[in-house]
């Protein structure tokens, strides 16, 4: 259940957001479901962009360090009235640009164009 809620949080983080530079916590609302009941909860996620520079020459032996916006996460439980089963959801405690950790994050390259914040 935690994985499903985390995926929903991360998907909603990018939906309808404008450009944001720097890494910082932001408040969002998400829908959670338990016992067939749905309720909106408010949580905090990490959002923003971290500086990264692609090298002209890409070596197969030494990859450039990729930094991502991440932080310390904890989990809280929400009980929906009339349902004995609680819903666990993530809450970001702080956010910073850190080295991508392949043990808990997909650090691969994004295969498509990344939209720019610049308007020409």
Curated annotation (Swiss-Prot):
Note the SUPFAM superfamilies from the entry: Cystine-knot cytokines
Query: Signal sequence span per UniProt?
Result: 1-18
Which PROSITE patterns does the entry mention? Answer: GLYCO_HORMONE_BETA_2 (PS00689)
Presence of the UniProt keyword Secreted in the record: yes
Disulfide bond positions: 23-69, 35-83, 46-95, 50-97, 100-107
The record's annotation in InterPro entries points to:
Cystine-knot_cytokine, Glyco_hormone_CN, Gonadotropin_bsu, Gonadotropin_bsu_CS
A GO cellular component annotation in the UniProt record: cytoplasm
Where does the protein end up? Secreted
The GO biological-process annotations, alphabetized, read as: G protein-coupled receptor signaling pathway; ovulation
Keyword list, A-Z: Disulfide bond, Glycoprotein, Hormone, Secreted, Signal
Note the superkingdom of the native organism. Eukaryota
Report whether RNA-binding shows up as a keyword of the record.
no
Q: Which GO terms describe its molecular function?
A: hormone activity
The UniProt entry, under Gene3D superfamilies, shows:
Cystine-knot cytokines
The entry annotates sugar attachment on 27
The similarity annotation says: Belongs to the glycoprotein hormones subunit beta family.
Q: How does it assemble?
A: Heterodimer of an alpha and a beta chain.
Q: Which PANTHER family match?
A: GLYCOPROTEIN HORMONE BETA CHAIN (PTHR11515), LUTROPIN SUBUNIT BETA (PTHR11515:SF11)
Main function: Involved in gametogenesis and steroidogenesis.
Identify this protein by name: Gonadotropin subunit beta-1
**What gene does this protein come from?**
cgba
């Amino acid at each position: 259940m935690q994985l499903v809620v985390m995926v929903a949080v991360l998907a909603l983080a990018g939906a309808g957001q404008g450009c944001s530079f720097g890494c910082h916590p932001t408040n969002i609302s998400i829908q959670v479901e338990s016992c067939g009941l749905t309720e909106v909860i408010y949580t905090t996620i990490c959002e923003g962009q971290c500086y990264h520079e692609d090298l002209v020459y890409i070596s197969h032996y030494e990859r450039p360090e990729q930094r991502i916006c991440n932080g310390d996460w904890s989990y809280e439980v929400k009980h929906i009235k009339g349902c004995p089963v609680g819903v666990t959801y993530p809450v970001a405690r702080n956010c910073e640009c850190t080295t991508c950790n392949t043990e808990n994050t997909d650090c691969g390259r994004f295969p498509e164009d990344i939209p720019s914040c610049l308007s020409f």
